[in-house]
Amino acid sequence: AELNKLKIWACYYYHQMGFNVTHIIPSENIKRDKDNYLKKNPFKSSTNNRENYDIIRQSNVDMETFDWHNAKGIGTVAGFNGLRSLDFDGSTNTALLSTVLKILGLPENYEWVVTSGSNNGFHILFYCGNFEFAGYKRRLKRYFPNKKHKTYFKCIDFIWYNHLILPPSLHKTGNNYKFLNVEYPFEKPLLVAGYNLRNMLFELCYEYGGFNIIKN
């Protein structure tokens, strides 16, 4: 998909899938963050105000007001209707991905696996209710691998209420986010049980009686 078709993807695909949609204009984000003395990745921040997007359904009129002509990315907000994401950083290991999908009870060719624009990580989108290890509202929790898996990935971020970047958004490297197994998913993300997430953490991150985590 081309970036100049972002509005079409937003209005006629992601929004119809049930997502609340954001748009990303890096140049506008840089100016805004500079004025507010903030340091954020301009390719990952929503340009529009996304306050309450995790609890209130977005209207079509709201999306129509966005500057899609200049947008370089599209996103959504985790938390709405239980939409979640796992962000595996520092990994291109297909064996790891297969293991994770199996533990989570997802098909091996799961449609909602996204290859990061960095080409050094992947995201898995799914639905899930409350999960005690996921962190607090508007904060992410990061887990690090145990010794057995330290060469497989750098960390896992639980994106529970935060901003998610969606294909075909532009990454700062100049690459685009892409779905791994399909051009675009046909079905909505699947439901993952909390106990499967717990099993994944114990397999990949548990060591010496606890988890090595950072709260952001």
Predicted regions and their residues:
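Conserved phosphate/metal-binding and DNA-contacting active-site motifs used
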Residues: A1-N216
